[in-house]
Amino acid sequence: MDTLSENVSADPEVMHGKPVIEGTRVPVEVVLNTLAEGVSIEEICKEYDLSEEQILSAVNFAADKVSKEEYRALEA
């Protein structure tokens, strides 16, 4: 298991190696998609038995990854 950031890890044996909330099988992707659907942090905590700190760690992990990417528009 690799710790990718605080509260986020990846293991090829867990969820096909996708980043998950450490100690769970909840992918960061699921947390982000659920937030994007307008579900509150409190509701996500209850649904997935997570803490607010874990949710915010997932958001920070994703923000860090996006900030390091370079995007270019494709020409038509």
Predicted regions and their residues:
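Long, charge-rich, low-complexity alpha-helical segments
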Residues: 27-30, 34-76
